[in-house]
Amino acid sequence: MKLIIQIPCLNERDHLGATLADLPRSIPGITSIEVLVIDDGSSDGTAELAEQLGAHHVLRFARNRGLAVAYAAGVDACLHLGADIIVNTDADNQYRGADIPRLVAPVLAGQADIVVGDRRTDSLAHFSWLKRVLQRWGSNVVRRASGTAVRDATSGFRAIGRKAAATLFVHNRFTYTLETIIQAGHAGLAVANVAVETNPQTRPSRLFRSIGGYVRRNAAVIVRAYSMYWPVQTFGFVALLLLLTGLGLGARFLYYFAARWPQESGHTESLLVGVGAVVLAFLVGLMALLGDLIAANRRLSEQLLVQVRQLDLAVGRLGDGPTIPGLQRTTAAPWSDAPALAAPSLPGGARLALHPGDPA
């Protein structure tokens, strides 16, 4: 069972050393641990430092492409390198490496496809009250949109099984956290939570520079996800509101027309706005129909992409697959777990299988 820990980086030279030193060198049930550093166009020598500190793989971008792109490229590289489980963590040492064994345990046990580290944001000292409210609101919205029980939707500390990693695709460039959870719920993947601890903050968040901007961009991600996966419900709701508004204004015009005719012709403005609202309702209804047809085509396309990705990975394991641009293998040896280690216990007395096919 191979675990690859991926770390997206942008000018993290000052923090990467502590992050790598904190990672576990062995985990019961995992036979090989490797580290992939994704250098998102850093200008401070982050990639060179990663090699010096013993990272096993470095994926370099010539320029900054954004966190979501770096995350998705890292997942592709991990799959290409044969990872059975992928753990994503931050380069600023926000998350504790000691929590990784508990994070991967549900995936090892076959109880979850994705495990999200719950930071319990209500108790984080460096979170302002407004940030806590926004995090709670965002997680509630994502829970409803995804049909999962995720408690900390914006947490980037997560473990992903190979099947789930091959199924999910990131479409936006801002962040992957919300979109992948919504996709996972829509795809029927099992999402679990594990409470984790966080280290003291080492620098301000680069995604949360402006509260207004952060809310707008995350709201856009959620609206886009609703439009992609539930177009009939999303556009149908808007069309219904417009239709009811138009009919209400039309009824108002008829009431005043009947009450005051022939002295007055009624409130003509209500008639004009009402007709416009009904026309818009019809157009938005057509958008709902077209969105549903596009969604059906997208589902077929995603299924095809998953099959192509799995075929590419199978060919890659034979050594004949295409290489990933910018991916470099260093001289560091994988961290290996001794095969004699006992499997960790789970709540209720269950035990993890050390290898695929072993009885739990």
Locate predicted features:
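Cell-envelope/extracellular polymer assembly enzymes that use nucleotide-activated donors
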Residues: K2-I4, E34, E179
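Short hydrophobic beta-strand elements that form part
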Residues: I4-P8, V37, R60
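Short, well-formed alpha-helical segments that are part of the catalytic scaffolds
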Residues: E12-I27
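Residue-level preference for short helical/loop micro-motifs built around acidic side chains
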Residues: D14-A18, D44-E48, H57, V69, ...
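Short beta-strand/loop segment that forms part of the nucleotide-sugar
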Residues: T31-G41
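A conserved acidic beta->alpha catalytic loop
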Residues: D39-A47, N93
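Acceptor/aglycone-binding surface of glycosyltransferases and processive sugar-polymer synthases
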Residues: H57-H80, I85-V87, G97-F174, L178, ...
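Hydrophobic helical membrane-anchoring modules
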Residues: H171-A360
